[in-house]
Amino acid sequence: VLTRPAVEAGERLGFLPGDLVQKIDPYLRPLYDALYELMGFEKVQKAFERSALEIAPLAFMRGRTLNNAFIILDEAQNTTPEQMKMFLTRIGFGAKAVITGDVSQIDLPKGQSSGLIEAERILKRVQGIAHVRFSSADVVRHPLIARIVDAYDAAGSAARRGQDRA
């Protein structure tokens, strides 16, 4: 099961036309793109046909129990604390969950806490939960991306040092 929150990056596009599938497709498109790249279009389609693969918006997870499933929550930095708790409490028997997110790319409204940051703080001592942090050395996209990440990290560090002096 693949899921992610429906949060836009910066600009708000407003209401989208069409039925439910057409409305949520733009938010889930990155998951489809990654699957097609990894498995190929035909294998992905066959996995959907066999119900071996499911992509669902995070908003539709409430009330579910995901037993014997491998669940990936992508872009978790854009969950609210309430959404994160709701997601974490969907994990059923025999299930494993992987939560990914980049806390330097939070697109939530100003003043809204990230569920990923809060979950890491709350769950850091809970047995059976591990946290892994990656750096620019782990970037698998174009080599330029690692340098971009480093430049933004350096600029952020410099800005924080400047705020500390104020």
Report the location of each language-model feature:
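Conserved helicase motor core of SF1/SF2 NTP-dependent helicases
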Residues: V1-L73, Q77-A166
